[in-house]
Amino acid sequence: MAKTRVHELAKEFGVESKFVLEKFKEMGEFVKSASSTVELPAEMRFRKEYGEKLKAEASAAPAAPAEKPAAKKAPAKKAAATAEPEALAAEPAAEPAAAEAPAAAEAEAPAAKAAAPKPGPKPAPVAEQPAPPAEPEAPEAPEAPAASAAPAAPKAPAPRPVGRPGAPRPGNNPFASSQGMGRRPAPGAPAAPGAGDNRPPRPPAAREGGVPGRPGMPRPNPAMMPKSPSAFGAGPGGRGPARPGAPGRGGAPGRGGAPGRGGVGTGAPGRGGAPGGGFGPSGGGRPGGGRPGQRGQTQGAFGRPGGPSRRGRKSKRARRQEFEAMEAPTIGGIRVRKGNGETVRLPRGASLTDFAERINVEPAQLVQMLFSLGEMVTATESVNDETLELLGEELNYVVEVVSPEDEDRELLESFDIEFADDEDDEGHFEARPPVVTVMGHVDHGKTKLLDALRHANVASGEAGGITQHIGAYQVHTDVDGEDRKITFIDTPGHEAFTAMRARGSQSSDIAVLVVAADDGVMPQTVEALNHAKAAGVPIVVAVNKIDKPEADPTKVRGQLTEYGLVPEEYGGDTMFVDVSAKSELNLDKLLEAVVLTADASLDLRANPNRDAQGLVIEAHLDRGRGPVATILVQRGTLHVGDSIVAGPAHGRVRAMLDEYGNELTEATPSRPAMVLGLSTVPGAGQNFIVVEDDRMARQIAEKREARERAAMQAKRRVRRTLEDFMASMEKGESQELNLILKGDVSGSVEALEDALAKIDVGDDVSLRVIDRGVGAITETNVDLAAASDAIIIGFNVRPQGKATELADREGVEIRYYTVIYQAIEEIEAALKGMLKPEFEESTLGQAEIRAIFRSSKVGNIAGCMVISGVIRRNAKVRVIRDGAVVADNLDLASLKREKDDASEVREGFECGLVLRNFQDIKEGDIVEAFEMREIPRA
C-alpha cells in the first residue's frame, strides 16, 4: 500500500498544501514539499489532531465566496490606511481637498504639459541653511492639485517605525540603468513613514497620449527631511527632458527641486518631468543618497561606497552565540559549543551524525574530536555506548542510551499501539489457563516429566538427550471433576541456555523446579531458582527420580530450605511433590498442586475480545513451510488472516498449528501455537502484536530491523585505538578467528553466540561472529566466509544445494555440531592453538673448563668436564665466570668426545668444545647448556 502524500492530505481536508506542511513542521515532522510522502504514524497524528477541526471548518466553507471581492480590495485599503495617518496628522481639514484631487488632476491633464508646477508651502527648516534657488520650469510637470494651495501647519518629521525593512542596497553593476544615487522611487510606491511630509499626497499626472498614470500613492518627499551638510555643492540640476515620443513618468517635482538634492546635474536624457536628479547632499542621510538611517550607497560603478557603513547593534542572541563560541572547549584543535549538562537521549548503535543533530554541531567536528581522543570512527558508523558517553562527557552532555524496551515502546507509541495494556473493562475479562515453566539442572528429568504428562517422547529426539530448544505444550487435567488446561513451557538446563531459561520464567505464571532426588541441588538448579524469584512467580518443587535406590527427597528439602524454599510440611508456603517421570508416579498430584497454586496465588484472567499480543517462544526455518514461530498468546485472540509483527518479522497469519500438528482457527489467551506466514525468522523472546494492516506491520518491522542492525554493528565493532594500530603495525597483525553461526532455531544460535563470547584466551587472539542465522548453510554463507576467512559453524543444520561443493572449491571449513558444549570446547581449543607460543628456559647441564688448547684453525678449544646434566650439540650455551654471565645465547661450533664428534656428553665425562664467535674463555669458567621449550597456553 502506497504512502500518502502531502497534497493528497490537503485535498482530502480542503486546505492548501502549505497549511499541511506548516502543521507537520509544528508536529516536529520533516516533510520537504507537497509531493513528499508521509509516514503512517505522522499521518495518524495529523488526522487525530487536526482532522476533526478541518472537517468542521470545511462544513462552514460555503460562506467564504461572499468575502472574496472584499479580499481583493485589501491591498488598496492597506495602502490607503498607510497614508491616512500622515494626512490626518498633517491637516485634518485637507481631507475634502485630497478627495477631490484625482478629479482635478484628470481635468487639468492636457494643460499640465505647458504649465509650471505651483510651489507649495515649505515647512519650517530644521537647521539654518541658505534657501535653495527657484526651481526651473519643467515642461511636463503637472499642475499642482487644489489641496496644495491650502497651507498646512509645519510639523516635525514623525519618528521612523522600528523594524522597517530597508531598501535593497544597489550593487556595483556598471551595466545597470541606475546605481541608486538620487534615484527616484517608483511612481505609486508608498511613502516612507519617516519622510516628514506634512502635505497630502500629490495625485499623479496623466501620461502622454492621454493615458492616465497609476493611482495616486503617497510619494516620499526628501525636501521635508532634515538637511545635512553637503559633500558636494548644492545647486539645481536635472535629468533633462524626456526623449521625443517616449512617454515620461509622473509630473511631480523631482528630487532636484528639493533642498540639498541639486548639484552635479548630469543633463542626460532620461525620465521626463523629474528635475534635479544629480548628485547632491542627501536629505538626512549620508553622502551617496538614501533615506535617513539607511546604509551608505555606491557613488559609481566601481567607485568607493558613499560612506562608512554603520554597523547595527548586535542582538542578544548574536552576542550570546559569540560568547559561547569563545568559551567553547577546544579538543584536537576543534572548537565545539559546550553543553550545560543537559541529557541527550540516543538509540543503541547511534552514529556521530545522530549525536551531532541532537547538539546542533557538524558531524565532521565530532569525527575529528574522536580522532584526537584516539578513536577512528566515521560519521555514519554505528558507535558503541562507551564511545558516545566518553564524547558526551568531553562536551558536558549526559548521554543516555535508550534501552531496547524503551526504544520499542516509543516505536509502538508512534503508531498509537500500547503493548501489555491490561487496563480493559473488568467485564471483558475471562479466566485463562496458567502458564507453567519447567526449570532445573541438566539431566534432572524435566523433558521426561513433560513427556509423561503429555504421553509423548520428546527427549529421544534431542541430540545427546539434552534439551536445546524451548517447547510449549498444553495438557488437560481433571481437578474436582472439572476439566482444567495447563500450558507447559520446557526450558533447557545446560548452562549455555541461561537466556532461554530467563525468557521462560518471565513469560510464565508458575515455575516448576525439577530436582533429582539422587543428585540434589546443582548449579543450574540455583540459577533457575534465581530466575524464578527475579520474575516474581510462585514455585512448585518436583522432586524427581524418587524410584531410584539412592534417592533422598529429605536431603533435597533441606538444601532448598537454605535458598528460601521452605516446604509446607516444615511450616513454609512452598509445595513439594515427590514424582517419578519414568514410573509416572504422582503426576496427578503435581498437576493438582499447580492448579491449587494458580487458584490461590494468582488472578489468571485476560480479555479475549481484542487484538492479540504475546511472546515468541521459539522460531525456526522450515524447508517446506518457511519461517515458523512458536508463539504464546498473552492477551486477546489471534485469528488466521491477522496482520502480525514479531520483532523484525511481519506478515499475515496463513495457518496456525497446535503442538500435535492440528490446524487451529484461533488462539485464545495462554494458548501456544505455531504460526506460518512471517517474512523472516523472528528472535526468540521477542513480542508479537496484531496491527491494523500489512502496511503498518511492514513499517514497524523495518524500523525494528534498522535499529537492531545498528545496535549489532556497534556491538561487533572492534574498538581500535591509534595506540593499538601502531602496536599492531610494529609487531605484526594480531590473530582473529571469524565465525559464521547457523542453527536450526534462533534460541540455540543466540545461546551459542553468547557462550562463545565468554571465551577469553587473552588479548592476542580475538573471536568475531560476522554473521548468524537460522536455517541451512547456503552458498551465500560460503561466499561470505571465503571473503572474510571465516569458519562456518553448523548447529543441527546441513549445507543446502551446492554449498558443500563451493566450500570445497573455496577452501572454507564447515564444522557440524549437535551438542552445544562440543562446539564450545572445540572452538576454545582452536583459539588457544592460534595463540603465539610461549617458551620457557630449561637448563640441560653444566661443564667446567679445565684446560684451553689454542688452534690457528678453529681458535680456542675448551677442554671441559661435564659436572651436571648433559651438554648437547644443538643447545644454546652461556659462559659464567665468578657467578656472573660473561656471554649468553652462544652456539656450539664443535663438540667432541676424545677425537670423535658427539651429539651429547653426559655427566662425568670429558669433552672438548668450541664456542662460535667467542674466544674469551679462561680456565675455571662454567659453560651452561640450555634450551627453550614451548609450553601450552592455558
Swiss-Prot record:
Low complexity bias locations: 57-68, 77-117, 141-153, 180-198, 224-233
Sequence segments annotated as region (G1): 440-447
Pfam families with a match to the protein in the record: EF-G_D2, GTP_EFTU, IF-2, IF2_N
A GO term for molecular function: GTP binding
Gly residues compositional bias, start-end: 247-293
Organism domain of life: Bacteria
Residue segments, region G3: 490-493
Start and end residues of each stretch annotated as G5: 580-582
InterPro entries in UniProt: EF-G-like_DII (IPR053905), IF2_II (IPR044145), IF2_N (IPR006847), P-loop_NTPase (IPR027417), Small_GTP-bd (IPR005225), T_Tr_GTP-bd_dom (IPR000795), TF_IF2_bacterial-like (IPR000178), TIF_IF2 (IPR015760)
Location(s) in or outside the cell: Cytoplasm
Record keywords, A-Z: Cytoplasm, GTP-binding, Initiation factor, Nucleotide-binding, Protein biosynthesis
Gene Ontology cellular component list: cytosol
PROSITE patterns: G_TR_2, IF2
Biased composition (Basic residues): 310-319
Region (G2): 465-469
Chain spans, region Disordered: 55-322
Pro residues bias spans: 118-136
Region (G4) residue spans: 544-547
Residue ranges of domain tr-type G in the record: 431-603
Binding site for GTP: 440-447, 490-494, 544-547
Predominant place of localization: cytoplasm
Biological role: One of the essential components for the initiation of protein synthesis. Protects formylmethionyl-tRNA from spontaneous hydrolysis and promotes its binding to the 30S ribosomal subunits. Also involved in the hydrolysis of GTP during the formation of the 70S ribosomal complex.
Sequence similarity: Belongs to the TRAFAC class translation factor GTPase superfamily. Classic translation factor GTPase family. IF-2 subfamily.
Protein name from the UniProt record: Translation initiation factor IF-2
UniProt organism field: Nocardioides sp. (strain ATCC BAA-499 / JS614)
Taxonomy of the source species: Bacteria, Bacillati, Actinomycetota, Actinomycetes, Propionibacteriales
